[in-house]
């Protein structure tokens, strides 16, 4: 009466689904279908890009993705923007271990500017890895190209001109220093993940010019 059921190859099945989504541009079609509809949003605490994603991150991201898919299926428009936390001890401590530094005086001797650039390199490196992990997880977001993030990581802190194509402008090639490009990652015109980097250019109010730019664009995007 019953036929023998073959072994369930879950990993192969997952790859087949991901390939289907990519070949048929399912996520892009969904975003096109819900564009301009009543928005639905929630505050997503950004993951710190200091190491590869852990199981606990995947657990939380699965819940977030489920909620977003549910509301998209109900015809609500979503921003679909991932965030990366780039500042604070989570990043700095890992860089201290990476460089073999154990005291504030050693960091100062190494050079604050060099230390900051090394922190940014680490963030971009692991943002690329976490992006790949999240895509593998099936997490639907407007992702940056991981290879472009790695290219920025390699050039940050130098005067080298880098080429970058934002997710929302895939046919556009932006040529600038990695520092200048990184300062604009995630802005509404470019799309892609938001990075909590700050710049050294400050306005009289004490806020960085990039933060003010993002605030202005975010307000415009939300109205």
Regions found by a protein language model. Name each.
Residues 1-223:
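N-terminal, positively charged nucleic-acid-binding surface of large information/translation enzymes
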């Amino acid at each position: 009466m019953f036929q023998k059921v073959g072994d369930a190859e879950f990993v192969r099945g997952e790859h087949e689904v991901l390939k289907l989504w990519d070949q048929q541009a399912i996520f892009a079609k969904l975003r096109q279908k819900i564009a301009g509809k009543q928005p639905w949003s929630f505050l997503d605490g950004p993951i710190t890009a200091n190491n590869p994603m852990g199981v606990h991150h995947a657990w939380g991201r699965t819940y977030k993705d489920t909620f977003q898919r549910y509301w998209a299926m109900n015809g609500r428009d979503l921003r679909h923007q991932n965030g990366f936390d780039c500042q604070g001890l989570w990043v700095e401590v890992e860089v201290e271990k990476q460089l073999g530094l154990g005291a504030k005086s050693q960091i100062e001797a190494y050079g604050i500017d060099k230390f900051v650039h090394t922190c940014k390199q680490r963030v971009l490196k692991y943002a690329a890895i976490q992006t790949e992990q999240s895509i593998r997880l099936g997490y639907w977001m407007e992702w940056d190209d991981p290879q472009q993030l790695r290219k920025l990581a390699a050039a940050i802190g130098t005067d080298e001109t880098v080429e970058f194509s934002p997710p929302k402008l895939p046919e556009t090639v932006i040529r600038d220093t990695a520092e200048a490009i990184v300062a604009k990652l995630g802005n509404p015109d470019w799309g892609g993940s938001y990075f909590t980097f700050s710049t050294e250019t400050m306005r009289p109010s004490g806020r960085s010019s990039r933060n003010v730019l993002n605030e202005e664009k975010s307000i415009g995007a939300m109205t």
